Design a protein with these regions (language model features):
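Rossmann-like NAD(P)(H) cofactor-binding subdomain of soluble oxidoreductases
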Residues: 65, 71-156, 172
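NAD(P)-dependent Rossmann-like dehydrogenase/reductase catalytic/cofactor-binding core
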Residues: 199, 206-210, 235-245, 249, ...
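NAD(P)+-binding Rossmann beta1-loop-alpha1 motif at the extreme N-terminus of oxidoreductases
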Residues: 3-63, 70-73, 100
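General beta-strand structural signal in soluble alpha/beta enzymes
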Residues: 113, 138-143, 183-187, 246, ...
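Hydrophobic anchor at the start of a short beta-strand
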Residues: 15, 37-38, 137-139, 183
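Internal alpha-helical scaffold of NAD(P)-dependent oxidoreductase catalytic cores
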Residues: 93, 104, 129-137, 156-243
Length: 341
């Protein structure tokens, strides 16, 4: 679907949100309250449904979207003249879409990554991929404990804009802020992004514990030791350790691991009940990022010489090399050590 020329009359600039999955649509539906927003969908029929019916039945069934939210399947219509471009594309397709965006985006227009994953071939974070392709555009990250359905329902929440440029960070903060969504800035892009990636792996592990029928002690142990892994990797990459106790780290972990709405946690629960990763992924319309990211996180940790035993076992389960029960046995049989070594 191409936007009709009359829909752009009087709009000199707008926010572009690239990717009409559940999270991209949710963010677009939020920021359109503050500034004109155009969403990009790959499929023209979905773009028309969002623009005309104000629905996204594929990813957000039963949700009514803002009537002034527009959507197009023509990327140039969405990106041209945008004052900010938000990238809501999964990690496995991020580079290709970012390369296409780079052809149309103006120099110096801020790029905001909404994705939580690593590029499997290079182990780069999504902000690094975007910066590779758009070296003259400031790149930031939006992350935090933000479950789409709760944001859409207007429930109170907070999120983080991570940006090395304070001016750009504050501009994005203003655009995203709502009466029900408090936005903080953080200059630690590396830490915020690593937190979002590793959080998905921790969520799968927490789901496995739940699926195996274990209680709160087991889950609390898993989450706490997972946070230690997150912090070790982030600090090795130059992150601020305080980031992992904030919204991007602890906040996102708590929300995701406690939520039945989380795809990553749901995958873990099913793995814990004995299902294979193949049967789980075949049954899902949207693949959980943690399934893709677990091996990449482990490889990045090995590159940095950082020990991440929980991540190692989650990766083994997600790669079909072991089962949940044997993975737990391996974790519990590790050599005894000090908590903070």
């Amino acid at each position: 679907m191409r936007l009709c020329p009359h829909t752009l009359v009087g709009v000199e600039s707008h926010i572009a949100v690239v990717g009409a999955g559940s999270w991209g649509t949710t963010v677009a539906n939020a920021v359109v309250k503050n500034q004109a927003t155009i969403l990009w969908a790959r499929r023209s029929e979905l773009a028309e449904q969002i623009s005309v019916q104000h629905k996204n039945n594929a990813y957000l069934p039963g949700v009514s979207l803002a009537e002034n939210l527009r959507c197009s399947s023509v990327l140039q219509d969405v990106v041209a003249n945008a004052s900010i471009v938000m990238m809501a594309v999964p990690s496995n397709g991020f580079r290709d879409v970012a390369a296409a965006v780079a052809k149309f985006v103006a120099t110096d227009v801020p790029i905001v990554s909404l994705a939580k994953g690593l590029e499997r071939e290079t182990l780069k974070r999504m902000s690094e991929v975007a910066q590779d392709l758009m070296p003259h555009n400031p790149v930031s990250v939006l992350t935090g404990p933000n479950l789409a359905q709760e944001i859409l329902a207007g429930q109170p929440a907070a999120t983080v804009v991570a940006c090395g440029d304070e001016r750009v960070g504050k501009m994005i903060q203003k655009i995203v802020s709502l009466p029900t969504l408090r936005v903080y800035t953080n200059p630690d892009v590396v830490g915020c992004e690593i937190a979002g990636v590793v959080k998905n792996v921790i969520a799968i592990a927490a789901g496995i514990v739940e699926g195996m029928g274990f209680g709160d002690n087991s889950k609390a142990t898993l989450i706490t030791r997972g946070l230690a892994e997150m912090s070790r990797l982030g600090v090795a990459l130059g992150a601020n350790p305080n980031t992992f106790m904030g919204l991007a780290g602890l906040g996102d972990v708590v929300a995701t691991c406690a939520s039945a709405k989380s795809r990553n946690t749901a995958v873990g629960v099913r793995l814990g009940r004995g299902e294979t990763i193949e049967s789980i992924t075949e049954s899902m319309s949207m693949v959980a990022e943690g399934v893709r990211s677990s091996l990449s996180v482990l490889q990045l940790a090995q590159r940095c010489k950082v020990e991440m035993p929980i991540t190692e076992q989650v990766a083994a389960v997600c790669e079909g090399k072991t089962n949940a029960k044997d993975a737990l046995v391996q974790l519990m049989a590790r050599t005894m050590k000090s908590e903070f070594d």
